[in-house]
Amino acid sequence: PDFAIIEACQVVENGDVIEIVPTAGVGNVPTFCRLADKVIVELNEAMPATMRGMHDIYEPADPPQRREIPIYTVSDRIGTDCITIPAEKLLAVVKTNRPNEVGAFTPLDEVTEKIGENVASFLEAEMKAGRIPSTFLPIQSGVGNVANAVLGALGANENIPPFEMYTEVIQDSVVGLMDEGRIKFASGCSL
């Protein structure tokens, strides 16, 4: 049989189904759970069960029935807050207590800071020229030092209004800008 081993912050028995709340990363976990014959859940008690509600778990249909993914704004929600599996698929729940291990980025240097300033200045100029609305547009950010420099420069630029963003990983710089009110909403695959 095929097995899926996944991490969760909460596992709830709800009749014939098990509700699994992932931790900081979802990615392909719903697909692994759907395709596996048996699922082993690592219940990580270092991750708060209050993470339930952060996730928007959605799997598109297989072709040829696949349709567009109906996300039209950054804050749209189209899925569920947990992964559900039939109760008979759950093989085991193994408890652990391990915080996320996140590698640190090197500090920003003159080059990365200048890149950030240039991007922010370019976007500001595009707004002033009318090619970007005065309310700004959602951005898509990568991960790492250059992304942090760009986000920092956008956040520091008073002529750029609070904005929304898509990203693969909602990293510390994004959370900081959310706390400051500079990012209104962020959508990502991992925290």
Task: Give the predicted meaning of each segment.
Residues 1-138, 145-191:
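Conserved phosphate- and dinucleotide-binding cores of soluble alpha/beta proteins
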